[in-house]
Regions:
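Short, surface-exposed helix-loop/turn micro-motifs enriched in polar/charged residues
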Residues: 81, 176-179, 195
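N-terminal amphipathic, basic helical "cap/leader" segment at the start of enzyme domains
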Residues: 18-129
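Bacterial N-terminal signal peptides
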Residues: 5-13
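A short, structure-level motif marking secondary-structure boundaries and short turns
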Residues: 20-21, 149-151, 200
Length: 203
């Protein structure tokens, strides 16, 4: 089986159980593989092995998703409309939910407890995935959060981050599937989101 990504990152529980901040190792910018090969092998997968993902792989995955690749300007691997960097990546683990802090390349604890069921929505196979990534767009970074155009830009930006995740997972031989199904209301409560922060997609 392909190593779980669902992102099936089972990073040993010990790595997260007691830490409110998890420092990630520096991303490996010299990983093997080509973009063309990754695109040719990209696929959505809903069956996962339970083998743990290393902290190094999680680090590379999050950096590829929406990390900072130009530190002098603070710009990201994923472009965003007007460079507003509206998409935040939340890491949902059995032990708790974390926000990926791209600037410091670390995970910050948001809520303790298992909220994988909120990510699953109506799809039960997600509930047992060791980890999911939830993509949240804060459309207020564009101005009026109620403006349709701003919400569309947020959805577009989340889609770009999602594609980065899919391509990285293909190259790294990790299984994943992009999803829009989730219990958005519960996630907004658990993750302490503002009204302007919209759950767009998850993996």
């Amino acid at each position: 089986k392909v190593q779980l990504l669902f992102i099936c990152l089972m990073l040993s529980a010990a790595a997260f159980a007691a830490d409110k901040v998890v420092k990630l190792p520096k991303p490996n910018l010299n990983r093997t593989g080509t973009v063309m090969k990754a695109l040719s092998e990209r696929q959505s997968t809903r069956e996962y092995a339970s083998k743990a993902l290393t902290l190094a792989d999680l680090s590379d995955l999050l950096w590829a998703a929406n990390g900072i690749n130009r530190s002098d300007a603070g710009k990201r691997t994923a472009p965003s409309a007007l460079n507003k960097q509206d998409v935040d990546v939340y890491v949902i683990l059995p032990e708790g939910s974390y926000l990926y802090d791209a600037k410091n390349h670390q995970l910050n604890l948001i809520a303790e407890g298992d909220y994988r069921g909120a990510v699953a929505g109506g799809q039960a196979f997600v509930k047992t995935a060791p980890v999911s990534l939830v993509l949240i767009s804060d459309v207020s970074r564009f101005g009026d959060a109620q403006k349709t155009q701003n919400q569309l830009m947020g959805a577009m930006d989340a889609g770009i981050v999602s594609q980065n995740i899919s391509v990285f997972c293909s190259a790294a031989k990790l299984a994943t599937v992009p999803r829009a199904s989730m219990d958005a209301a519960q996630l907004k409560k658990v993750l302490k989101l503002k009204d302007s922060q919209i759950p767009m997609l998850n993996h």
